[in-house]
Amino acid sequence: MAVSAQLVKQLRERTGAGMMECKKALTETNGDIDAAIELMRKTGMAKADKKASRVAAEGTLVVSISDDQKQATLLEANCETDFVAMGDEFQEFAGKTVELVRAKAIADVDALLAAEYEAGKTVDDRRRELIAKIGENMALRRFVTLSSQDGIIGHYVHGNRIGVLVELKGGDAELAKDIAMHVAATNPIALDAASLPQDFLDKENEIHRAKFEQSGKPAHVIDMMLEGAMKKLFSEVVLLNQKFVKNPEQSIEDLLKSHKATIIQYVRYELGEGIEKEETDFAAEVMAQAKGQ
């Protein structure tokens, strides 16, 4: 039978399940909402939905990259514990999903969840199966795909917890990977000073000026002190101004010039960003690893 949008809406309101799951259950039960709920409980969908409110701050970051390094996708998949995150089933799910995103040029998470994972099963179907089987909430939180016509995409993943993609014009694969590792370690705010958010600049100017004015020095001296403070700040938060972690005698800008290369764009994900959880300084781990190479 044809399932009306109103029936699907009612079932979603009662179960919290996704639209496709509700439509499928209603179709199989000829529009009987109570029977559909019972069916969803039997198949694990209802069990999965009960876990949907639990915080999934652990997980993994995975990358799919084309053989010619012209295209790459970075995806964050979440679960509740590190134990499950390292399990074969979760890793297989994340790995197959990121490949699907890149191969099908999927645009957003909603489209990904509705995409075919395997014959007769969507990505969200598989996600809910794993939730029901393993007993933890799981989510496909975000992903990004970079493509390059004239350059290459470099990538670096640290411990499945920090992931970086870098689009580089000029240079080679080794340089692209080095830049990606550097971004993982230093977490720059912007590629160049001109790209820094104006509200960030205004706030930093205000803070430093207020501090320097307490010295009682003349205005022109305070202006010089402020200029120096902002220059130091740029060396810390602007990618091109930062010192290369593998060679602190050289800035990223100088490194690029020596290879006649240009960074077009970069993306950095850190697992669980914005999710309330116990923090671990994985960036410091990358920094130590990079300096040791």
Curated annotation (Swiss-Prot):
<dbReference type="InterPro" id="IPR014039">
    <property type="entry name" value="Transl_elong_EFTs/EF1B_dimer"/>
</dbReference>
<dbReference type="InterPro" id="IPR001816">
    <property type="entry name" value="Transl_elong_EFTs/EF1B"/>
</dbReference>
<comment type="similarity">
    <text>Belongs to the EF-Ts family.</text>
</comment>
<protein>
    <recommendedName>
        <fullName>Elongation factor Ts</fullName>
    </recommendedName>
</protein>
<dbReference type="Pfam" id="PF00889">
    <property type="entry name" value="EF_TS"/>
</dbReference>
<dbReference type="InterPro" id="IPR009060">
    <property type="entry name" value="UBA-like_sf"/>
</dbReference>
<keyword id="KW-0648">Protein biosynthesis</keyword>
<comment type="function">
    <text>Associates with the EF-Tu.GDP complex and induces the exchange of GDP to GTP. It remains bound to the aminoacyl-tRNA.EF-Tu.GTP complex up to the GTP hydrolysis stage on the ribosome.</text>
</comment>
<dbReference type="InterPro" id="IPR018101">
    <property type="entry name" value="Transl_elong_Ts_CS"/>
</dbReference>
<dbReference type="InterPro" id="IPR036402">
    <property type="entry name" value="EF-Ts_dimer_sf"/>
</dbReference>
<dbReference type="GO" id="GO:0005737">
    <property type="term" value="C:cytoplasm"/>
</dbReference>
<dbReference type="GO" id="GO:0003746">
    <property type="term" value="F:translation elongation factor activity"/>
</dbReference>
<feature type="region of interest" description="Involved in Mg(2+) ion dislocation from EF-Tu">
    <location>
        <begin position="81"/>
        <end position="84"/>
    </location>
</feature>
<keyword id="KW-0963">Cytoplasm</keyword>
<keyword id="KW-0251">Elongation factor</keyword>
